[in-house]
């Protein structure tokens, strides 16, 4: 049984802490909204909202909604892009990047768009946000949500991480990897996830996350910051994933998240031998959220550049003049870059 495997693993790792950490203060998952700074400040929103709110500890812009029958998709503020409907603890990862206006930011696994909307709000219309989603149908949802949220400086991609890494090595100041995962933190919110859970899924997601993390690291500029997050408890996808990455990437340092104001440290016994792993952050059900894991990685300013990508020459595609005008106006720093290579769009 899936839940038997999960509980046996977690009890072995946590011991007598299992019942404490998995005891949620509420019976059902919290409902919440995250306010976009492109539309309103949290203070203005709280003063004008016509439904009961409580500030969330996970993000200054996030609120818990205390109204069981609240339908966010029917509210005018939703359609005006004032808020994104999001479980409150899911808003915790994006602010850890420390995005500032003018930066080049990548959201690697961006759909449906909650974290991208947070990153766009931090950019305040300056710089560029590249929001990528590998699954085409989800990329359409991502695009729709960013349009609704009033984001004007984003490029939505439907690409593999490897192809983006080939095109844009060491390009981004900040990278968010909210990795595809086994979803153990969502069992309460999505009960069907528990019925589909097994160790093979965990191992598959761990391997996929490792591949995505490698490509993300290649796209991060020296001195840049990468945040890796999941909504699972599995060590292979969390602490052990980060420990394995650090063992092969001495140019990266694990930043300490213990002053972030929420959650608890990473678990040492989930990555034996990596004493720094407690610098990561976990949110347990006992903390008032669903299950989340976060690690913040900083790339050395002196990191060596990756080997140049060699692309087989081909007949250049004719670039539409409308696209050139758009790039020159919106992203002037991209104007001198090739827009296509062997017929493939780079951006």
Question: Could you tell me what each predicted segment is?
Answer:
Residues 1-347:
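S-adenosylmethionine
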């Amino acid at each position: 049984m899936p839940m038997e495997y999960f509980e046996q693993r977690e009890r072995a790792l946590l011991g007598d802490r299992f019942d404490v950490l998995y005891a949620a203060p509420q019976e059902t998952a919290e409902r919440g909204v995250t306010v976009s700074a492109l539309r309103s400040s949290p203070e203005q929103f709280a003063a004008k909202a016509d439904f009961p709110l409580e500030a969330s500890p996970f993000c200054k812009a996030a609120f818990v909604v205390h109204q069981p029958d609240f339908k966010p998709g029917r509210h005018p503020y939703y359609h005006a892009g004032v808020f994104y409907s999001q479980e409150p603890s899911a808003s915790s990862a994006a602010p850890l990047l420390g995005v500032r206006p003018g930066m080049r930011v990548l959201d690697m696994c961006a759909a449906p768009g909650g974290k991208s909307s947070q990153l766009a709000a931090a950019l305040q219309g300056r710089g560029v946000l590249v929001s990528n989603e590998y699954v085409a149908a989800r990329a359409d949802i991502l695009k729709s949500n960013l349009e609704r949220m009033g984001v004007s400086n984003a490029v939505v991609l439907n690409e593999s991480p490897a192809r983006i890494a080939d095109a844009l090595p060491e390009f981004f100041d900040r990278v968010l990897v909210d990795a595809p995962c086994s979803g153990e933190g969502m069992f309460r919110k999505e009960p069907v996830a528990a019925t589909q859970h097994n160790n093979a899924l965990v191992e598959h997601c761990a391997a996929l996350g490792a591949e995505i993390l490698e490509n993300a690291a290649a796209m991060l500029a020296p001195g840049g910051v990468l945040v890796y997050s999941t909504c699972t408890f599995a060590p292979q996808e969390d602490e052990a994933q980060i420990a394995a990455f650090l063992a092969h990437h001495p140019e990266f340092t694990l930043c300490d998240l213990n002053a972030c104001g929420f959650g608890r440290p990473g678990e040492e016994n989930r990555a034996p031998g990596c004493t720094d792993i407690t610098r990561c952050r976990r949110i347990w059900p006992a903390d008032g959220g669903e299950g989340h894991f976060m690690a913040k990685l900083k790339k050395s300013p002196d990191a060596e550049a990756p080997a140049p990508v060699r692309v087989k020459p081909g007949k250049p595609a004719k670039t539409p003049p409308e696209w050139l005008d758009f790039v020159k106006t919106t992203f002037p720093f991209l104007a001198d870059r090739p827009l296509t290579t062997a017929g493939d769009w780079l951006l």
